[in-house]
A protein has these predicted regions:
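Aliphatic-rich helix starts adjacent to a transmembrane/signal segment
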Residues: 9-66
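N-terminal trafficking/processing presequences and adjacent post-cleavage segments
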Residues: 24-29, 34, 197-208
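Short linear sequence signals and composition-biased patches located at protein termini or domain-edge surfaces
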Residues: 199-201, 205-279
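N-terminal leader/signal peptides at the extreme start of proteins
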Residues: 1-11
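Intrinsically disordered, low-complexity coil segments
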Residues: 3-5, 72-83, 123, 157-161, ...
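Short helix-loop boundary/capping segments at the starts of domains
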Residues: 39, 43, 55-59, 63, ...
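Extracytoplasmic beta-strand-rich oligomerization domains located immediately C-terminal to a leader/signal peptide
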Residues: 48-203
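Acidic/polar N-terminal loop/beta-strand segments that form early-domain functional surfaces
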Residues: 19, 91, 259
Length: 279
């Protein structure tokens, strides 16, 4: 009976070592590729988050600046991570005055054309009447009873819908300039945005001050009058807010610089806003 031969198959030591080396090279390449891809994704996601946070802050400030009273903007342009602040007065209403006091010793009440929408206030808190503000120095000099700004005590409709309202001030006042278009604004208390350390805050309800307030002087430091707008800011060597005065050919320009940073990644955002300067 013939003997059936069987063949033995296998691999040599050299083949095994070569296979291990090739597999190791492929594994290292795959791990490196996956690691780089993951790092790239995380970096991209982090930068996207920073950009989104910074853009939201800029959009918020831009929206409010479009409603700023003409010539009410003032900026503390100190560079770095100190108290960099931007201040303005938000407009509430605008109308035409009828007999505002400009001469003599002044008056504590006068008439205006009805606001649109109709506005009557029995005891307004921090509402001011403003006529023809031409610069922020004059505007914020609130202690002067002959300036462009006066605190409102009440707004009433004494004749029941005849189209004329009466504004009563908290004290006798004489406005120092007539508006060429008889324009009157109602404004709220000033609002400030400040970069303090690595955070951007919004401040309100601190009153009108001759000198611009900072967090170290007269701005509130608790909720609800201080609100966090953004964090992760490193403005070292940068100026968060800069005001370029208006000229005869263009409006005033406010420049914003925010450098958002986290985990070694940074995104710098530069933005400019044109402000109204026709009072």
């Amino acid at each position: 009976m013939p003997i059936k031969r069987t063949s033995n198959s296998g691999f040599t030591l050299i083949e095994m070592v070569t296979t291990i080396i090739i597999a190791s090279i492929l594994a290292a390449g795959i791990v490196t590729y996956i690691g780089d891809s993951t790092d790239g994704f995380l970096t991209s996601a982090n930068r996207s988050r920073l950009a989104s946070s910074g853009r939201s802050a800029l959009d918020r400030m831009t929206f409010e600046m479009h409603n700023a009273l003409p010539n009410s903007v003032r900026a503390n342009a100190a560079a770095g991570n100190g108290d960099q602040c931007l201040e303005f007065m938000p407009m509430l209403r605008a109308t035409t005055y009828v007999n505002a006091p400009f001469t003599g010793s002044g008056s504590s009440s006068f008439n205006v054309i009805n606001f649109n929408p109709t506005t009557t206030v029995a005891s307004p808190a921090g509402i001011y009447a403003v006529i023809y503000p031409i610069n922020n120095t004059d505007l914020y000099n609130y202690n002067d009873n002959r300036g462009p700004l006066a605190l409102v005590d009440s707004i009433t409709d004494p004749n029941g819908g005849d189209g004329v309202m009466t504004i009563t001030l908290d004290a006798v006042h004489r406005f120092n300039r007539r508006s060429p278009s008889n324009r009157l604004f109602l404004v709220d208390q000033p609002v400030s945005f400040c970069v303090v350390g690595d955070r951007l805050y919004r401040y309100e309800n601190y009153g009108v001050q001759n000198t611009q307030c900072t967090p170290a002087t007269c701005l509130p430091n608790t909720l609800p009058n201080r609100a966090l707008i953004a964090d992760e800011i490193d403005n070292t060597g940068l100026t968060a807010f800069a005001l370029e005065a208006a000229t005869r050919r263009r409006n005033a320009i406010i420049s914003f610089e925010l450098n958002m940073t986290s985990d070694g990644d940074s995104v710098r955002l530069d933005h400019e806003v044109l402000t109204h300067n026709v009072p």
